[in-house]
Amino acid sequence: MLSSVWVALGLSLTCTSAFSLISPAWFQTPTFSFGILTYCSWPQGNSWNQSCVTFSSLEDIPDFAWKVSAVMLLGGWLLLAFNAIFLLSWAVAPKGLCPRRSSVPMPGVQAVAATAMIVGLLIFPIGLASPFIKEVCEASSMYYGGKCRLGWGYMTAILNAVLASLLPIISWPHTTKVQGRTIIFSSATERIIFVPEMNK
């Protein structure tokens, strides 16, 4: 049961993170929107007639802060995807092959992915000071959008980063010391594992 929940959470988090990365709605005006990898423009009052451009390489991204942010966010997403695939294989593997089902494997990978995503999200608004964005957002600067307002894509990316950082915290086994022995409590099972104390 626990493994299926973690697989569902890992896969859904990976999918929504990918969706927010390709979204052009991180910051927007009435006629323009942009994200980490895509920007779109349309005539005033006709948002159904959009013309969108995707940055095909890092050289096409207009600002260095954007490039760093894109690398961090894509790296974090790749780690999330790797972790989700690993969780899926862990969940469908026979119990004899993976005997320790009491805790979720590799919470550290997910923690590194969450850290990379958070750093990428914090670096991205520095790019609001670039000439490319100043032309659209008028009077924008670092961490200030000018006439551009936050879009749902950036908010979704923030929510994904928060969830990605909470999941590893939940999955770490809880430990307590009782009479010289370490007892590992796992919320996944009702077993208690006694670990003898090592002499220092």
Curated annotation (Swiss-Prot):
<dbReference type="InterPro" id="IPR019372">
    <property type="entry name" value="LHFPL"/>
</dbReference>
<comment type="similarity">
    <text>Belongs to the TMEM211 family.</text>
</comment>
<feature type="transmembrane region" description="Helical">
    <location>
        <begin position="150"/>
        <end position="170"/>
    </location>
</feature>
<protein>
    <recommendedName>
        <fullName>LHFPL tetraspan subfamily member 7 protein</fullName>
    </recommendedName>
</protein>
<feature type="transmembrane region" description="Helical">
    <location>
        <begin position="113"/>
        <end position="133"/>
    </location>
</feature>
<dbReference type="Pfam" id="PF10242">
    <property type="entry name" value="L_HMGIC_fpl"/>
</dbReference>
<keyword id="KW-0812">Transmembrane</keyword>
<keyword id="KW-0472">Membrane</keyword>
<feature type="transmembrane region" description="Helical">
    <location>
        <begin position="68"/>
        <end position="88"/>
    </location>
</feature>
<dbReference type="GO" id="GO:0016020">
    <property type="term" value="C:membrane"/>
</dbReference>
<feature type="transmembrane region" description="Helical">
    <location>
        <begin position="5"/>
        <end position="27"/>
    </location>
</feature>
<keyword id="KW-1133">Transmembrane helix</keyword>
